[in-house]
Amino acid sequence: WIMGHMVNAIEQVDEFLDLGANAIEFDVDFDDDGVAKYTHHGIPCDCGRLCTKYAVFTEYLDYVRQVTTPGDPKFRKELVLLALDLKLQRISSEKAYAAGVDVATKLLDHYWMRGWNGGRAYILLNIPLVEDYEFIRAFKDTLRKEGHEQYNAKVGINFTGNEDLDEIREVLEKLGEDEHIWQADGITSCFPRGTERLKKALEKRDTPGYKYISKVYAWTLVRSSIMRRSLRLGVDGVMSNYPDSVVKVLKEKEFSDKFRLATYADNPWEKFTPI
């Protein structure tokens, strides 16, 4: 999975897909009551990027629905995963439950269309800190109450704050979640980051019977040397400001027979097992 990073304006969606991304990450900004308002990162953000691009959240969902609905004139078959970077750290943890209800409801109304020809992409809920775990409970509760639990099959969970992996597992156990789990490891592209935690996450993913990590990705990679380093370790995905650079690296002899771009036929919730 090549994840285009900080794709917050509607016009950037096709721009990043044209560069080779098959997944996009966008920031979801909330008001003080936990209502998702905009796709917006704000200042500071990654080096060399404009931090202020934004869209109204529901309008953004309407657009990506079209891009991921077969038969729609805007359909792009390569876009298979949407990662929502939920800016819950900007609001009180007490509002995490309200935020979960709001995001689930807006996805039902504007993306899935409650079963009426909605978008088909997989959804990854990127949660910054384990203390905001009530967001997940609220999201699942809302799908159940609205009679649309079938969409759980399309939704995964990912804690992105580089917290202790065992603490993350404990929170997932508390929630009763042991599938559809990704694990991110990374830092803003402005700073270097070692591989110690990334290696631990990959080790857990590859431990037979370990349920709490099915995919691991590294973010936000801009240098080809760091992309190569991550691929050598065996990541499932790379988040980058430059998807075309990742495409180029994947074509190199060292990687071209080991990796390929994920398509809609690839299940993002299953561990990859080499043949």
Curated annotation (Swiss-Prot):
One of its GO terms (biological process) is lipid catabolic process. Its EC number is 4.6.1.-. One of its GO terms (molecular function) is phosphoric diester hydrolase activity. Keywords: Cytolysis, Dermonecrotic toxin, Disulfide bond, Hemolysis, Lipid degradation, Lipid metabolism, Lyase, Magnesium, Metal-binding, Secreted, Toxin. This is Dermonecrotic toxin SpeSicTox-betaIIA2i. Mg(2+) binds at residues 25, 27, 85. Its main location: secreted. It is found in: Secreted. It catalyses: an N-(acyl)-sphingosylphosphocholine = an N-(acyl)-sphingosyl-1,3-cyclic phosphate + choline; an N-(acyl)-sphingosylphosphoethanolamine = an N-(acyl)-sphingosyl-1,3-cyclic phosphate + ethanolamine; a 1-acyl-sn-glycero-3-phosphocholine = a 1-acyl-sn-glycero-2,3-cyclic phosphate + choline; a 1-acyl-sn-glycero-3-phosphoethanolamine = a 1-acyl-sn-glycero-2,3-cyclic phosphate + ethanolamine. Signal peptide: none annotated. It is an enzyme of class 4 (lyase). The lineage of its organism: Eukaryota, Metazoa, Ecdysozoa, Arthropoda, Chelicerata. Dermonecrotic toxins cleave the phosphodiester linkage between the phosphate and headgroup of certain phospholipids (sphingolipid and lysolipid substrates), forming an alcohol (often choline) and a cyclic phosphate. This toxin acts on sphingomyelin (SM). It may also act on ceramide phosphoethanolamine (CPE), lysophosphatidylcholine (LPC) and lysophosphatidylethanolamine (LPE), but not on lysophosphatidylserine (LPS), and lysophosphatidylglycerol (LPG). It acts by transphosphatidylation, releasing exclusively cyclic phosphate products as second products. Its cofactor is Mg(2+). It comes from the Eukaryota. Disulfide bonds join 45-51, 47-190. GO terms for cellular component: extracellular region. Binds 1 Mg(2+) ion per subunit. Belongs to the arthropod phospholipase D family. Class II subfamily. It comes from Sicarius peruensis (Six-eyed sand spider).
